[in-house]
Regions:
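N-terminal [4Fe-4S]-dependent radical SAM core
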Residues: 1-10, 239-252, 337, 341-344, ...
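Structural recognition of alpha->loop->beta junctions
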Residues: 99-118, 180-215
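Short, acidic, Ser/Thr-enriched surface-loop or helix-capping motifs
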Residues: 267-268
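Conserved alpha-helical substructure of the radical SAM core
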Residues: 1-112, 127-137, 334, 351-353, ...
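Short catalytic/ligand-binding loop motif for oxyanion handling, primarily in non-cytosolic enzymes
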Residues: 20, 31-33, 66-68, 95-96, ...
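Short, small/polar residue-rich loop motifs at catalytic or cofactor-binding pockets
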Residues: 258-261
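Conserved strand-turn element in the central/C-terminal portion of the radical SAM core barrel
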Residues: 85-92, 129-131, 142-184
Length: 361
């Protein structure tokens, strides 16, 4: 049994995706594409449940979970074990396979995050969607799923609709330079338009004044959640660097803190365990579930223990982590290193005490 409990485990049921988003490293991922076999998934879920290893299990890392051939069986398996399951989807199958809408509602999954990201036809171009899926079809499928879930009195699924915020931020090194939604005015305009669209006919819709006040609190360039109803929230997230993988010059971090292996871990579809959701290519393999238990990998074996011990001493020793936590200038690298300590050691604990559930994916 692990001597500590993770906040979340990212469980990648597949790394196959039907989108090729410009802001995602899918195009440069070198791993073989594939799906997790059911016996391996069952082993992972059994151990997580038996030892209460994580507060949240998320079908999330790379790939699109809703094109996993066994996705609804996988959801049922997780929920049958009493796991707090979250799922992140691009939402494309809500139009391509409309039966997915009601099937997902019927599962009773606690939370679904829809990576809308690009909220209009112009920005949808950067998603690399299948050619037969037009922007309005994509938006309509998502809209119908959200409305159906809101209208279903038997569903307690909470949906987060995620928007990509490309407002420049001093702590971030973008994966690529792009413009989707930038600044307070543009983001508030998009949030308002989508709130009106999703809540049309909803009995729990806030008053217009209340809705505008909630959206007016949005601050650009940071992660934020705006609750619309108990079952629906809008979420904004800044453009990320994916570990500075494509930056030509990076000043590596030498100190700082990351919650990889202490608060989170990932399980890739082939059973490889990685320290965090950003290790999309399995560059820091901690072990494999086919050979060892998750408890052994996280709490006994040297790779995870060494990484965690280093971060606990505010040391960044792994070269992949050094690059991820570094930046393209000395000043920004220093800001990011100091900021990582301030965020994880001060800001994050305070926010979790003030707002239970804060920081959940």
């Amino acid at each position: 049994m692990v001597s500590y409990r993770l906040e979340r485990i990212h469980l990648e049921v597949t790394n196959v995706c039907n989108f090729k988003c410009d802001f995602c490293p899918d195009a440069i991922m070198e791993r073989k594409r594939g799906h997790m076999d059911l016996p391996l998934l069952e082993k992972a879920l059994d151990e997580i449940a038996e030892h209460n290893l994580a507060k949240i299990v998320a079908f999330h890392l790379m790939g699109e979970p809703l094109i996993y051939p066994h996705i609804f069986k996988a959801i049922d398996m997780a929920l049958a074990r009493g796991l707090n399951l979250h799922l992140t989807t691009n939402g494309s199958t809500f139009h391509i396979r409309p039966e997915h809408r009601q099937k997902l509602i019927n599962t009773g999954i606690p939370k679904v995050t829809i990576s809308l990201q690009t909220p209009d036809p112009l920005t949808f171009i950067i998603r690399g969607a299948p050619p037969q899926l037009k922007p309005e079809q994509y938006f309509d499928g998502i809209t119908q799923y959200v409305r159906d879930n809101l209208a279903d009195p038997n569903s307690n699924t909470r949906i987060h609709l995620k928007f990509l915020d490309t407002t420049p931020h001093p702590f971030l090194v973008p994966h690529k330079q792009m413009h989707v939604v930038e600044g307070k005015a543009q983001m508030q305009q998009e949030l308002t338009a989508w709130a009106d669209r999703l809540l049309d006919g909803c009995s729990q819709r806030p008053s217009d004044d209340d809705l505008r006040q909630r959206i007016a609190r949005h601050k650009p360039g940071r992660w934020q959640v705006i609750e619309l109803t108990p079952k629906l929230a809008l979420e904004t997230f800044p453009l990320d660097s994916w570990g500075n993988v494509e930056s030509t010059e990076v000043i590596p971090a030498t100190f700082g803190y990351c919650n990889g292996t202490s608060d989170q871990a990932g399980i890739l579809y082939d059973g490889t365990v990685v320290p965090c959701c950003k290790d999309y290519d399995g560059q820091i393999p901690l072990g494999n579930l086919r050979d060892h238990t998750l408890c052994e990998i996280l709490d006994v074996q040297k790779p995870a223990c060494g990484l965690r011990q280093g971060f606990n001493q505010l040391k960044v020793t792994n070269p992949i982590c050094q690059r991820c936590m570094g930046a393209d200038t000395q000043q920004k690298a220093l800001l990011r290193q100091v900021g990582s300590v301030a965020y994880f050691k001060v800001y994050n604990p305070i926010m979790k005490r003030l707002q239970p559930g804060w920081g959940e994916i």
